[in-house]
Amino acid sequence: MHKTIFLLLSLLLPLFPSWGQSISGQIVDEKNTPIEYASIIGVSPLDTTKTIVSAFSKEGGYFVLDCSLHKNDTLRLKISCAGYKTFHTVVAANHTFEKPIALEESVIGLNEIVVSAYKQAITLADGKIGIDTEKLRLGNNDNVLDVLKRAPGVVVSHDAITVQGNEPLVVIDGVKQRMPMGILLTYLKSMPAANLKRLFIKSMATAENRLSGEDATIELQTKKMQTRGYNISNTIHGTLLRNNAFRWGDYIDIRARHGNLSGSATAGYVKSKLKSEEEERFPYEQHEKLINQKATRDKDAYFGVLNMSWMPSFLKGSLNYFVSYYVDDSRRKGKEAYNTDAVLDKLTEREINDWTDLLSTNIEYLSADTLKHQFKISYGLLAGSDDYAQTVNNSLGNSVNTNKTMDGHRHIIEAQYTLKRPKFVYTVGNQNYISKMNENVKSKNGSDFSMWETIMGLYMSGKIKLTQDLSLYLGARTEYAHYKYLVANTISRSKEWNVAPYLRLDWKASNNFSSSLYLTMKNTRPGYFSMLPGATYYSDNEYSVGNSFLKPSMQYDFKIQNLLFKHVVVSIGTRLRSNVFGNTYNIDNDGVRYTKPQNYANLLSIYADASIPFSFIQGKLNGSLYLYLRNLSFSHLAYDVLPSTFNRKNNWFANGNLYLSYKPTDNFAIFINPFFKTRNNLLQERRKGTMSIDMGMQYALPKNKDIAFALTIEDPFNQLKGEHLYNYGRFSVTRLTFPNTQCIRLSMTYSISNNGKQIKVNKNENDTSRFAK
């Protein structure tokens, strides 16, 4: 332990620099609401016509004037913003305002103010891509997933979100969304994009991230209420799919502010009936086997989210509370036909009922940012349960019942302190995760499984501003993990120590070129869901099982990300994972196929991607092109996986999409979105490439734009049929999937609000007119 702490300190001690002169502070209004895009100009006290330095206030109303290149001992500051009286003061050239600067509202009445400010549509700073979401929105009917589809480096499919191949952590207004991907997709698909303000994409982990499950981060910032009032929006949507399948739902969002209390409450319901069909072909003992599966799944999903912030003056900060609850009630009925050489062997009926609930809550105290110090502490709880039942009957008179329950919880305790100086930011923090998961297969004696997971993490990081345009981030994280397993009344334990260093170099070479270089290494642990040993049957011929003996995988990353001409994002990188874990395809002693997660190989990947936005016809025609290319190579394969592999070297894969929208008027817009992916060759699997297109339109009433309609057509030519080839060693299986992707979707959004004042921000045309107006 002492060696680990000494290593962390020795990594970060060289970060402390000699700090240059700067003036920093925060600008707020009389109600202590931060003011963004206020103009701060520093002039000579002897000659007020001579501007020495200037800046605009940023997110949260904060500003920093760099005075290191000027010899003036004092400066006269002029702080102004439309709708407020100009503020004047004289300060030293190395001064920090301990209290926020409160601007007095102008006596001129304001119903709606338009402020012009310098703000790029896309930025690359601190290793994150920042995006003004207004540039990605098509209209009031857009949901958050629609916006993410148009963001650089983000790929959204019907069952996943990835950032350069990584499943990201999603953070909304500082709250980590600790929910499974399927639940998260339902929530984001229902959340209106009109509530978004900024979007940040971090494609690499830093010391502040856990060593597993947080390789990328998508941070969503919603709009804040500037005055007392409320805003209510409701979206109802319906989707008609092929074969009489459907999906419909309703989502309501309420945002309000009263005095020092502000918050939002959301609730939603989604009802779906989806039909699926799969076909499998494989040779078996010199015969051709064919399995055809058809199923109908009915699902009811409910969710509610409450997010509140209380900022009384005596707290000297804010108390933030978040709670979400999700229920997923799924019922699946299917029929399976088993054939040998085109002769029917048997028919099987399979019925699955799966009820899941998940509660997530978090309370946090965040101290006021004094521009020198900031502290936060939080407690979170994640708790859920799952009740799974499967009944199988076949034409041979056999019957099997499987009943399985799971429940668990996780306590999360976090604390973080940040020390800020004009050219240096130092952060230290602690994160603790205390978890327990139980699984019980009721129909099988001795099947009880319990796992306790305790993780204690300590991290430190420092960011130093080497020059005006060059900064260095160094960080280190250590984690201690303790596991205890109870399997069939037998207890086993394991312990792990992990240390991970992080380096990032951010360079703004010019107004048209910014670059970030990343170098990290870390130990990635498997999630405990993949370690639960209970079996789940998908057909009479295949099941899946967990593996409680999975080992961590060491991961090394190197990446360069560039922002060209203020809009084009280009990156290239490589990742090496030793002793990587994942699902493998096997055959048991009875000749039945099964999948099982295990450590199976070393994996080297090399990748590159590019995102190119464009705008024509005075901003009426907008779009973006995204391309991704990756190469995989496997080595040092596990002995039991070796006989069942395809190509181990030079497995190339590419995908891309083009988003094109035309908005001739403020109340009407259309879009098309063609996309493709090539054949994807993995170690035991080959996936056939596909190509398809989505299209749609949005319309808002001319006299009442708070009422809007949207019509979307997805996969109109039914091209997203999946064709996979799996290698089980003794034979390979070809699986065809006919998904519910061809559909037409209609939605209507209605908003009502009561705000005393709204402030709209227009972008500087010299900066963003070529992207969009």
Report residues per predicted region.
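Short, acidic, small-residue-rich periplasmic hinge/interaction motif at the N-terminus
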Residues: I41-V43, K78-Y84, T96-K135, V156-H158, ...
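Short, acidic Ser/Thr/Gly-rich low-complexity loop/linker segments typical of extracellular
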Residues: L46-Y62
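N-terminal periplasmic accessory domains that precede
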Residues: E98-A102, V144-V147, L184-T186, L211-I236, ...
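Extracytoplasmic beta-strand/coil segments of soluble accessory domains associated
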Residues: L145-P180, E208
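Short acidic/polar hinge/loop motifs at secondary-structure boundaries
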Residues: Q177-M204, I252, G304
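Face-selective signature of the C-terminal outer-membrane beta-barrel domain
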Residues: A301-S330, E349-A488, S492, D506-S516, ...
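Outer-membrane beta-barrel signature, preferentially recognizing the C-terminal barrel domain
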Residues: R493-S494, N523-S571, L576-S578, Y594-Y607, ...
